């Protein structure tokens, strides 16, 4: 809906895509593209700046940048988009840090983040601000504790990459990274012996 509204408001400024404004499939695809760009940390203005240097597709990319900017304008400050909520939280935290303060939503709070499987730009920005502001931030990842091997595409490779990114982010923000604690006891299923047995079977081949 918001992509369609952005197209309607742009009207004569959009040549390639305006005729698709009533296509639900196009609007959905455009919204997904915008979401991917936002996850990569790119804004509509940045895309507009990059588009002219993209060869034959520069015209279409420039129009996509206009749609993206219109979409951002319609959403500005509303927090309707989950990615925007992360950006708004990071804005508030960074502004408070610049004043030497901590926002109310983080005062006297312990921060625990459970099982990142992705680590996009908005999350990275908010995490960096929290690492700079808070005494401790605890992150739980699903990992086997083995060292990361370059080129590894195994089950736990994503978690290992996230752990490496977190250590780098901590150093960048002047925070120390604690030695990881590997939990080998299955506390999650302590009250469900059947599930505990299945978990052990999957991990070891016996139960």
Regions found by a protein language model. Give the residues of each.
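A short catalytic or substrate-binding loop motif that flags glycine-/basic-rich loops and adjacent residues
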Residues: 80, 119-120
């Amino acid at each position: 809906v918001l992509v369609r509204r952005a197209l309607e408001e742009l009207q004569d400024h959009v040549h390639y895509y305006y005729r698709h404004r009533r296509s639900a499939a196009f609007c959905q695809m455009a919204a997904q593209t915008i979401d991917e760009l936002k996850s990569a940390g790119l804004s509509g203005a940045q895309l507009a700046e990059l588009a002219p240097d993209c060869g034959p597709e520069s015209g279409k990319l420039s129009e996509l940048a206009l749609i993206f900017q219109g979409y951002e304008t319609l959403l500005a400050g509303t927090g309707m988009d989950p990615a925007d909520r992360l950006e708004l939280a990071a804005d508030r935290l960074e502004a408070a840090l610049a004043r030497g303060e901590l926002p109310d939503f983080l005062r006297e709070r312990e921060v625990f983040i459970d099982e990142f499987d992705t680590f996009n730009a908005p999350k990275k920005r908010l995490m960096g601000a929290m690492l700079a502001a808070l005494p401790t931030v605890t992150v739980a990842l699903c990992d086997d504790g083995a060292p990361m091997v370059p080129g590894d595409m195994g089950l736990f490779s994503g978690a290992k990459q996230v752990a490496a990114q977190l250590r780098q982010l901590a150093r960048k923000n002047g925070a120390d990274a604690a030695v990881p604690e590997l939990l080998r006891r299955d506390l999650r299923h302590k009250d469900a012996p059947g599930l505990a047995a299945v978990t052990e079977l999957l991990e070891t081949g016996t139960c």
